[in-house]
């Protein structure tokens, strides 16, 4: 059995130091801030990113450059026989589709396996952990890809949006909808199950939005994930406000009776 390495991008929330500890590779996502290209966790720190965000900087994101991706593949294939690449969901970025096309080139075919399992942030990170475990158990790159894709709908993400500004800026809602939502002081709750980011519910307060998310997860536990509750992982991702995240963490622990909930900050989501 050949040596298999796991590669993901920084939208998984895995930083370079953690990647080194895990024995994997992480491709940094590019951010364009006031016309300058910066790379997450390379020359863009978390503190600097949120300073730019607070100051109203022009921020956008992009998929990793093709050259950067193939250079990383070439580098890894000098040491490993196969690469399992777990990029950002194909429903939210074209990076997965581009990588899949590149992996069919003669020099990468049968060596690079691109996983299209519709994950982002904490669910993408869990896919990385699953891939590591599968590789350690002796699975091939293709076997890991197939297993992860077979389980692509076994996840749910619920997101509370405190401001509609970035959804409007990114073109995910119309200016009119953003203006109306702001006027009514709405706190949308969004959902990711599979490919797309969809509206799930509307709340008037942060407290109500948090209650909606907790109930939604409980409903998923009782229905969609009823047969695999013992294997489920519960995670919290947040943007910027660590004190609010810690408060919500305690609420979720109390509701579910779980004390090993993972909590991570995510920059990619903040810019959208």
Predicted regions and their residues:
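Short beta-strand segments
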Residues: 7-8, 87-89, 115-116
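Mixed-charge interfacial surface used for oligomerization/domain docking
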Residues: 3, 11-25, 30, 82, ...
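A general structural signal for short secondary-structure boundary/capping elements
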Residues: 51-57, 73-74, 132-134, 161
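Detector for Asparagine
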Residues: 34, 43, 116-117, 269
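Glycine-rich phosphate- or other oxyanion-binding loops that anchor nucleotides, phosphorylated ligands
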Residues: 56-90, 97-98, 145
